[in-house]
């Protein structure tokens, strides 16, 4: 069975090999989805779903999505905003995707979205529903 993951940092380098000195072949933003090809101790070989790039990311830069078939697009960050994880705040870059599960909750449940971000999401959803 295929496994999938999601990037949980603002910006992540996709490396050609499983080490820090290898070439950066692409970058992924917060919320980008990928297929897990080969998990390892410190690095995981992945394939980005949006453009098909294959490379390695560090294991602490992503999290596994358990119910991949149950998620759908939530919104696209149209301005830079911050979210809080259990440990720190990170900035969501413009263009980052936020996904939801069937319960309409953001997939990244370990993150707390600020009131400002939630209001933008809600206003965007209501304007889309009216169309």
Put a short name on every predicted segment:
Residues 24:
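A basic, amphipathic helix-loop patch mediating RNA/tRNA/ribosome contacts
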């Amino acid at each position: 069975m295929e496994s999938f993951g999601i990037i949980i940092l603002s910006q992540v380098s996709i490396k050609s090999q499983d080490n820090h000195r290898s070439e950066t072949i692409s970058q992924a933003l917060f919320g980008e989805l990928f297929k897990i090809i080969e998990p390892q101790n410190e690095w995981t070989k992945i394939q980005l779903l949006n453009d098909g790039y294959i490379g390695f990311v560090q294991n602490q830069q992503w999290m596994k999505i358990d119910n991949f078939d149950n998620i759908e697009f939530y919104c696209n960050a149209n301005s830079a905003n911050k979210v809080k994880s259990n440990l720190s705040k990170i900035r969501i870059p413009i263009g980052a995707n936020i996904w939801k599960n069937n319960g309409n909750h953001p997939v990244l449940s370990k993150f707390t979205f600020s009131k400002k971000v939630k209001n933008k999401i809600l206003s965007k959803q209501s304007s889309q529903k009216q169309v």
